[in-house]
Amino acid sequence: MPKRILCFGDSNTFGWIGSLEGPTHRFPSDIRWTGRLTALLGPDCEIIEEGLGGRTLRDQFTVGSGVFVPGAGLCGKDYLPACLLSHLPLDAVVIMLGSNDMKSALNRSEHDIAEGMAELADIVLKFPWQELLDYPRPRLLIVSPPLIGARKMELAGERYVDAPRKSRALAALYKKIAESRNAFFLDAASCLTDEPAGEAHGPDGMHLTEHDHELLALGIAGKLKEILSLR
């Protein structure tokens, strides 16, 4: 049976194409980092995409997100249990969230955001589905999101006050969460080597470009091979 890997995230898992105006599209599946995992990991792995624009770790709304779903639908903490149960069995879960939580309207510090990630990690690692379904728990890979830099602040700085500093603090906090739970960690910023390094390079300063998706896929694939003992 193929290794089943759930990728849970926001618009950068969905494959949102950054745009400065008007409706946009998502990258095709073979361009998105999730789709590239299929090619990189081979036929012995099945990738399950669960990306939603505007998703937060534990807030039930995202002001000005432009996403037309009820507020609770954007809350990772509320949605994740049903998501896990609907996709069992799972061998690994990859979570990359935190960018939307840095919006000024939510008033979340970097420590608040990290606490939200800890709650999601505990759902994956402690949720009692084994009372009903006899499947082992998946391994967990926590991914800190790309950095927020000058480009995003030029375009929407009032919506992301202090976000550059917060985004640079998350990697260390997320790593501690992973280490304390026998989970795994990857810093997405370490994969994004184009200048300015560590940031998403879309025109809106928030979303990944095609090359960013390629680089991130390589980093995550390498980590999953380690986690799942894949060749």
Sequence positions of predicted segments:
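Serine-esterase "nucleophile elbow" of acetyl-processing enzymes
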Residues: 1-63, 81-87, 93, 210, ...
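Charged, glycine/proline-rich intrinsically disordered loops and linkers
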Residues: 58-78
